[in-house]
């Protein structure tokens, strides 16, 4: 059983956070939380999302599992104006999701969850560096790096106590340094890893510029990015595998 009413903004923000990595996913409909965990086809980027029942105007669920085509659901949600309410109800017999938006009614065929890629186990890494940064600074770094390269290095300099971003192209380079007074928080530890800029660009699309983003970094280790959505009623974690640099 699943029946809910949610604002268009909250639903769109939730779907966007996942669709930057995958086209389809499993959605767990627990009695107090909607949750999604998925990995992209190349097993490079992962997403773990929880949206509390309190993020909804109303929410009833009993532990079901559904599979959805994210692009189709996003298209439907995109028909709603900002602030409008969207009604969702699962028909368990037909395995279809009924969606109502201000008089418009849609019936979305669901996907067999067993046909969707297995959900990843996101490792509990004890990474040495922790950085809290504003979403707008991540956006600035990614945008600048994209002008010169297709990969980006993120790290922490423990000697100078700062977080840095490097991007090296064939002819041009980008370097950004942020000291503790330019960050929300910095727990310095040895960290330097190279990442695909394409993945970070996609993740960046879903990160609000006003969000506080917590980064966990290591030396040639995956990066974890944590941030809240839906007025802190939802939480997203991205994990991105590094590009291993040859000596």
Curated annotation (Swiss-Prot):
Keywords: DNA replication, DNA-binding. InterPro entries: DNA_clamp_sf, Pr_cel_nuc_antig, Pr_cel_nuc_antig_C, Pr_cel_nuc_antig_CS, Pr_cel_nuc_antig_N. Gene3D superfamilies: 3.70.10.10. GO terms for biological process: leading strand elongation; regulation of DNA replication. It holds the Pfam family PCNA_N. GO terms for molecular function: DNA binding; DNA polymerase processivity factor activity. The keyword Aminoacyl-tRNA synthetase does not apply. NCBIfam families: PRK01115.1-5. Belongs to the PCNA family. Homotrimer. The subunits circularize to form a toroid; DNA passes through its center. Replication factor C (RFC) is required to load the toroid on the DNA. Sliding clamp subunit that acts as a moving platform for DNA processing. Responsible for tethering the catalytic subunit of DNA polymerase and other proteins to DNA during high-speed replication. This is DNA polymerase sliding clamp.
């Amino acid at each position: 059983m699943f029946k809910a009413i949610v604002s268009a903004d909250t639903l769109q923000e939730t779907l966007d956070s996942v669709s930057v990595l995958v086209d389809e996913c499993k959605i767990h409909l627990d009695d107090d939380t909607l949750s999604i965990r998925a990995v992209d086809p190349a097993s490079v980027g992962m997403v773990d999302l929880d949206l509390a029942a309190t993020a909804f105007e109303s929410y009833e669920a009993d532990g079901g599992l559904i599979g959805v085509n994210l692009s189709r659901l996003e298209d439907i949600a995109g028909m709603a104006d900002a602030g409008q309410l969207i009604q969702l109800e699962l028909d368990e017999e037909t395995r279809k999701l009924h969606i109502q938006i201000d008089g418009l009614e849609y019936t979305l065929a669901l996907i067999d969850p067993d046909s969707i890629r297995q959900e990843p186990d996101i490792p509990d890494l004890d990474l040495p560096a922790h950085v809290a940064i504003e979403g707008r600074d991540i956006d600035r770094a990614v945008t600048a790096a994209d002008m010169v390269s297709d990969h980006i290095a993120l790290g922490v300099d423990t000697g100078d106590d700062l977080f840095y971003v490097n991007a090296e192209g064939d002819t041009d380079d980008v370097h950004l340094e942020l000291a503790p007074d330019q960050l929300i928080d910095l727990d310095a530890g040895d960290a330097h890893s190279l990442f695909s800029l394409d993945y970070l660009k996609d993740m960046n699309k879903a990160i609000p510029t006003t969000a506080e983003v917590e980064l966990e970094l290591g030396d040639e280790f995956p990066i974890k990015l944590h941030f809240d959505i839906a007025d802190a009623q939802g939480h997203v974690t991205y994990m991105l595998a590094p590009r291993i640099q040859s000596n």
